[in-house]
C-alpha cells in the first residue's frame, strides 16, 4: 500500500561516491524509488567537491514516488578535523588539547556553513560561536 504522505530521508553520503548499495539502496528502495536515479544526480551535483567529503542530504519522497533532495555543508567537526589534519577529536577535551585553531579559520568555516540552506538567516557571529563550541568539544584550542 502506497503512502499518502511525503517522507523525508536524511543520509550522509561521501561526495561523488553514491552507489545503490547500503545504506542508500535499502533506504530508497523501501519507499519505491530507484536508487540509481538518486545516485546519478547526487554524484553529478557533488562532482566538484573534494572526494570522500561527507555530504549530508535531505531527500523528500512524494506519494507519487518522485523525489527531490537538498545538499548541505559537511559537518563542522569534519571541517575542523580537515583543517587541523586530525583523525578524531579528544576523548577528554579540557585536558587533552589536539590542536589550535585561529579565529580566521573559525570565520572561514562559519562563512562556509552560512551557505547551508538550513542555516539561512542566522548571523555569522552566531555561526562563529557554534564553530568555537564544536572546536572546544573536540579538544581544539581557539587562539586569536
UniProtKB/Swiss-Prot annotation:
Residues of the transit peptide: 1-32
Database matches in InterPro entries: Ribosomal_uL11 (IPR000911), Ribosomal_uL11_bac-typ (IPR006519), Ribosomal_uL11_C (IPR020783), Ribosomal_uL11_C_sf (IPR036769), Ribosomal_uL11_N (IPR020784), Ribosomal_uL11_N_sf (IPR036796)
Statement: the UniProt record of this protein carries the keyword Glycoprotein: no
Any one Gene Ontology cellular component term annotated for this protein: mitochondrial large ribosomal subunit
Keywords linked to the UniProt accession: Cytoplasm, Mitochondrion, Ribonucleoprotein, Ribosomal protein, Transit peptide
The keyword Ribosomal protein is assigned to this record: yes
Gene Ontology MF terms in the entry: large ribosomal subunit rRNA binding; structural constituent of ribosome
Single GO biological process annotation from the record: translation
Subcellular location, record wording: Mitochondrion; Cytoplasm
Matches recorded under SMART domains: RL11
SUPFAM superfamilies (alphabetical): Ribosomal L11/L12e N-terminal domain (SSF54747), Ribosomal protein L11, C-terminal domain (SSF46906)
Subunit-level organization: Component of the mitochondrial large ribosomal subunit (mt-LSU). Mature yeast 74S mitochondrial ribosomes consist of a small (37S) and a large (54S) subunit. The 37S small subunit contains a 15S ribosomal RNA (15S mt-rRNA) and at least 32 different proteins. The 54S large subunit contains a 21S rRNA (21S mt-rRNA) and at least 45 different proteins.
Family: Belongs to the universal ribosomal protein uL11 family.
NCBIfam families in the cross-refs: L11_bact (TIGR01632)
Reported function: Component of the mitochondrial ribosome (mitoribosome), a dedicated translation machinery responsible for the synthesis of mitochondrial genome-encoded proteins, including at least some of the essential transmembrane subunits of the mitochondrial respiratory chain. The mitoribosomes are attached to the mitochondrial inner membrane and translation products are cotranslationally integrated into the membrane.
Protein name listed in UniProt: Large ribosomal subunit protein uL11m
Encoding gene, per UniProt annotation: mrpl19
